[in-house]
Amino acid sequence: AFADMTAVQEEANSSAHHIAMDAKRHKAYEEAAKLLNADPEEIALVESTSHGLNIAAQGIELNDGDNIVTTNLEFIQVALPWCVIRKEKNIDIRVCKPADERFTAAAFEPLVDEKTRVLVMSTLEWCNGWQSDMKEIGDFCKERGIYLVVDAVQQLGVTKIDTKACHIDILTAGGHK
């Protein structure tokens, strides 16, 4: 039996497959980093946009009394992980609802205070096509020590996203679009 297994292993070397897959993953990190103006070490390949948002929500330390800010036009999965955390901790979820449905730093300003830890939003809204000025919003968040978590699934690969210039702390996007 061992001789048969060895013969099969020589014919169909699964180690070669793993080495090839590792090389492809390494290339994927490099290509994603270029696309986002990030370092390859800053890239994590996850199952989906939703999975990335869940990791973000679980990975940011929130304390009782903290709040997060989001928008009223988000796809449900952008807000859902934070709603789960709200059940575990006494955090407030504040929702930005500008009359013109355009999300700007000025629109977020009234919702932000010293207990705001996270602003979570889409870079480009799925329901109306509004593309927020992420540089403006990123500067706004950085000045206040707020994590900026974005869902970029509608934008990634269509227009440039510079995570460094926009001070984006966590960006998540699936590759299917």
Q: Predicted regions span which residues?
A:
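Pyridoxal 5′-phosphate
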Residues: 1-177
